[in-house]
Amino acid sequence: MPLILQSAEESNRAYASRLEASFIDKNSKKMNIDLRDAVSRNFGFGDFIFINPRTMEEVARVHNLKELQNVIFSVPAESLQYHIIRNHVSRWLYSRAIFPVAEFLKQIRWEGLQDIDAHRKIIFEAIVKYRKMKNQGVVAVFQRDRFDRYSHFARIGDGSLGGKGRGLAFIDNMVKRHPEFSEFENASVVIPKTVVLCTDIFDEFMDTNLLYQLALSDADDDTILRAFLKAKLPDRLVEDFFAFFDVVKAPIAIRSSSLLEDSHYQPFAGIYSTYMIPYLEDKYEMLRMLSDAIKGVYASVYYRDSKAYMQATSNVIDQEKMAVILQEVVGTQYGDRYYPAISGVARSINYYPINDETAEEGTVSLALGLGKYIVDGGLTLRVCPYHPDKVLQTSEMEIALRETQTRFYALDLKNNGHNFSLDDGFNLLKLTVKDAENDGALDYIASTYDPYDMVIRDGIYPAAVS
């Protein structure tokens, strides 16, 4: 327990020194300032300052949990040992109400372990575990100095997340509440890294650039898109985007999330645009592509098909607002193209149950490559999660050969977006399954038809039909 000794007698400073207590001179004109500094320094408030125990000089300073995580392996051993013996780390965490980590580290005594490298690892892993736990299921405000690979979901702005954004936040929260999702070996159940530009950013963009008059007019889609592309996004977003690029280091999907989207009785799937951009080392080129994609999603609210759908569903177009989801694209790079081994679309209601299936059990449509193939109505593998061994397409040889997927979508990593257009798939490649076989992407997801034995075998085999 840190001590503070207050006295009007200067001679008592020696007693304070022997007790390793802070001394406050009551006769000092700045007594209140000295007291505040002593409390901040000894009770864990303020920055955590690592000191050299021999010289008492500062060797490192951290402002928050992320910075402590970053420096824990570089702090000199004698300094870290000095603070561990005195429980300074746990005290600092207590003062910030980070109780789980503080309680855990307080129990790890130097006398019991006496291994500085082990202490470093324990502190680091405790912080990482806590930050992962806190970040899941929470829509935190995006802070560029704190967003890192342990962050999952954040928002920029104070408006609505939109329908799709709310759905993703709900799923993230559900994953956090069900630890059984972490029980699968070599499988991590998480949503991709996500940042949502809330609807107030959309409002600011529309108002600042005076776009409403054109957007609500009868102008054609291309005219609306070109006007939106010429408009400017708020300058303050630039540094946030750069911070997001530094963490994700992967292609990014720019997805619509309007107020009305994903409502239960009025699905908006395929109405608004979704763009993808490749990851580039040149941040400014990525910024240009990302800005164009965000503006393209905003513009899609006012395309003719969108207005017609709004009218058909008895909604008012000038009341619609758009949030935008920036999301890491999960997949693997194969040369100049990028795609996942499997994409899926899950439906909570099975409208056409077969045999033992029930409507409440839902269905999943699975396909090779990007999910656009599924949304566009391509041939997919339909599976009921409750009956994974009973798949209609594999029940008979003729059906399996007739209804198997033959093409798929991949992101063209060479396309830098200079041909940006109304078609949100302008930089996607439509490839054959043979291309995926050459990439080695089918090894664990495909079966092969053997025409000699008239059977389907798991895996890929030469001189056969996949």
Features from the language model and the residues they span:
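Negatively charged, flexible loop motifs adjacent to catalytic sites
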Residues: 7-13
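Receiver (REC) domain switch/output surface
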Residues: 18-19, 34-45
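Hydrophobic/aromatic residues positioned on beta-strands within the core alpha/beta folds
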Residues: 4-6, 26
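Conserved mixed alpha/beta core segments that line enzyme active sites in large multi-domain catalysts
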Residues: 143-183, 232-466
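A structural-propensity feature for long, helix-poor, extended segments
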Residues: 191-242, 309, 321
